[in-house]
Amino acid sequence: GAESLREDDFPTSRTFTALKALPPFVNLYESERRARRRAFVAYLSELAGGTPPARLVVVDVGWKGTIQDNLFALLCRDGDTPVRSITGYYVGLVAEGAAGPGNDKHGLLFSAVGERSPRFRVFNENRALFEVVLAADHGSIVSYEIDAAGHGRAIRGEFEEGEMLAAEVFPVQR
């Protein structure tokens, strides 16, 4: 039946095109998108102690700064938030993504952006090791909401790797 249908490339499929043409879907999508954006800006405000800074700094493992690019599009493009620029610091960068004015990225240990850094190949070959050794001790954020008190709040997903990380990775991190 229809419930077992799987599209190989959903974003380019006829099914997705038809879905995007349905007014109920479009209305729900836009409503949720706006609500999540408001909640995310409120969450940033909470983290900043009142108002998000004009320059936001992102620190991550790497590799292209895609999350940073999405944050830049969300917070800086329309000019309707206090955030005017984002700077990212990464263990390594293998591509610049959408870096540009106001969206700067820096590879701290290695980088392929511009001139390749010394020993780039060695570090690049071991990216999976960096991901494992620098693993977080919590589930990923899956959404944002504004709670009953009007505060922005992150909603975390299940921490599926918790047991394995606790047994194998966290002892190495300490």
Which ranges hold each PLM region?
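Long, contiguous domain-sized segments
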Residues: 1-174
